[in-house]
Amino acid sequence: MKSRLALIVIIALAGMGIAAQEKGKAAGGGFMQQAFAAWNSHDPDKVVTYYSEDVVYEDVAYGAVNHGRAELRKFAAGFIEAVPDLRLEVVSSSIHNGHGVAEWVLSGTDKGLYKTGKKFSVRGASVFEMRGGKCSSNKDFYDLATIMRQVGVLPAQ
């Protein structure tokens, strides 16, 4: 009898965990879709509305750390200028208890990073934290060498 009760409790808790995970995916997908739509609008003022005033936004591959919305706005404006046709596509995302992760694809034409005029596409991931409905911490991870090879700065493998 005790083992049946334990099994029922385990199944119920597992179901609650799956429901919470699915709810997190829906919330994560919604936030990321909106934030990426802002990036895709190429409007830095729109981009920063999805981030807290004290956000720490880190582009790990490029070595850029931006503290606060003003620095993030400057970074976004520079990136949009360098890749004027940038496109971010959410592959998958999940937010749970204020922590999130998203897989994405970034594509565009290099007009200012290395000024080659060549197109690139790279998969990446963001690890982020949410506070008060805004992103308060974001770390982007991707393979910069992939971009460099695609735009001709590094030799193809």
PLM feature segments, named:
Residues M1-A6:
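Bacterial N-terminal signal peptides that target proteins for export
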Residues I11-E53, L154-Q157:
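Short, low-complexity N-terminal intrinsically disordered segments enriched in polar/charged residues
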Residues G29-G30, P44-N97:
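A solvent-exposed, acidic/Ser-Thr-rich amphipathic alpha-helical stretch
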Residues A35, V47-V48, V55, G68, ...:
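Hydrophobic pocket/interface hotspot
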Residues Y51, L106-G108, S126, Y142:
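Short beta-strand segments enriched in hydrophobic/aromatic residues
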Residues E81-A82, G108-K119:
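Short, cysteine-centered beta-strand-loop-beta hairpins and adjacent loop/turn segments enriched
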Residues N97-G108:
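A short hydrophobic beta-strand element
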Residues V101, S121-V151:
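Short beta-strand edge/turn micro-motifs at domain boundaries
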